[in-house]
Every structure is written in C-alpha cells, then in structure tokens.
Design a protein with these regions (language model features):
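Cation-handling catalytic/transport regions enriched in His/Asp/Glu
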Residues: 1-232
Length: 232
C-alpha cells in the first residue's frame, strides 16, 4: 500500500512508509532467521509481549542519520536529507511524548484493574476506572467520560490483560537499540548477536533469558525516556 508512482514522479516513500517497511521487515527477519525444530515455537510464535521487539527495533533506524544517508536522497538532485530536517522529524515525533506515555500507562493500569479482579464487579464503572489510573492522572477528570465502555482492545480486541505490551515493547526496543547506538548501528557483532539470541530462537526459551543473553542485562526504561526526549 505504498505511495504509487505517477506519470511525472516515481514511487516516493513518505517517512511513515519507511517506518512501516522497516517494522514489517523486522517481522520478516524473525521468520527468515528462525532456527527451531517445531513451527509452533518458530519465528513470531513467541510470548505476546515479546513479538514486537524484532519489528520495533528496526523502526529506530528510520531516524538515524547514517542509515538515512544510504538511501534518503532527493530523487532529482541526489541531495541527502538535510540534518536540520532530520532533527525536526525527531522533535515532531517526540512532541508531547511524556503525555502520550502516561496515556498508554493509564490504559494499561485500567486493563489490569479489570482483569486482576477475583469477584464480579458491582458498582460505578466511572469511579472504578478513575481509581485504577489515579497514579497516571495529571489532568482534571472530564465529567461523564468513561473509557471502559469503549475500550474494545481489552474486551473484544485480543489485548485483555495484555494492553501493557504496547509500552513494554517500546521499553524493549529502545533498550535493545541503545546497544547498537553504543557500538555503532551497523556493528556486525551486535547484529549477529541479535540474530543468534533473539531472531533465531523464536519461542524456544523464555524471552527474558534470550534478551539478557543479547543485552547482557534486563531492560530499563532509561533508553526509552532518552529517545523520547523526556530524560537527558
């Protein structure tokens, strides 16, 4: 579904299309580099909150100057994408990043509040959800607003007790990519380790075991906060 060519222009990718291509390419690598005996444990057949690591880590390359300079050129002049434009793209992506982060965290808290109950719920839904996400609430509550009654992700969309995985995937991909940033985004040793310890293993071992084998530690939130401009 990428932008089609016209009579006067070739097919030119938007920034979002580049991100989408890299994302889906990451899923493809997860399948192509799979090296397990059983299909049920191969490639993307992993824990639900681990499946997006190979795809989302690839998206990080989309804002790396050294990567963009390999292909992102003006289709007529051959001029590289200006560094100032790259910076503006990153700044735009990070606009209100802290608020967006809290929004996702609040949805995760609400999801867990519903699915960690041990008794049927009887009471005011609005009051219940306001208590659930109180830890992430920074703006005044909108009167009569009720997220639970329209939260299709957790009631009919397959994310019940798993909405947290959206933000967790960001923590994983940012922390993992920080190793590429430290060693060089084209470092073959780091890439080889990611292939061997993450991509080839599928679901044959616990995700955290595989992650620590690649990263040398458990993930922290620091890399995500730095990437989003929330922390220096």
């Amino acid at each position: 579904n990428f932008t089609k060519p016209t009579e006067n222009k070739p097919a030119l990718l938007t920034f979002n299309e580049v991100e989408t291509f890299l994302h889906e390419f990451g899923h493809s690598l997860h399948g192509m580099f799979a090296n397990s005996t059983y299909e049920s444990l191969s490639g993307t057949n992993v824990y639900w909150d681990f499946v997006e690591l190979p795809s989302q880590i690839m998206e990080n390359f989309a804002i790396e100057k050294d990567f963009l300079n390999t292909f992102a050129r003006h289709y007529q002049t051959g001029e590289n994408l200006p560094e100032e434009l790259m910076k503006r793209m990153v700044d735009a992506a990070n606009f209100n990043a802290a608020y967006a982060c809290l929004r996702q965290v609040s949805f995760g808290l609400l999801d867990m509040a519903w699915y960690t109950r041990h008794t049927p719920f009887e009471g005011d839904v609005k009051e219940y959800e306001q208590k659930a996400w109180a830890k992430a609430q920074i703006l005044p509550v909108v009167k009569d607003a009720c997220m639970s009654t329209q939260f299709s992700h957790i009631f009919s969309g397959g994310y019940s007790a798993g909405y947290y995985s959206y933000k967790w995937a960001e923590v994983l991909d940012a922390d993992a990519f920080s190793l590429f940033k430290q060693k060089g985004i084209f470092n073959r040793d780091v890439a080889g380790s990611f292939r061997q310890n993450i991509l080839s293993k599928g679901g044959t071992e616990h995700p955290m075991t595989l992650y620590k084998r690649f990263r040398g530690q458990e993930p922290t939130i620091d890399a995500l906060l730095i990437r989003n401009g929330i922390k220096n």
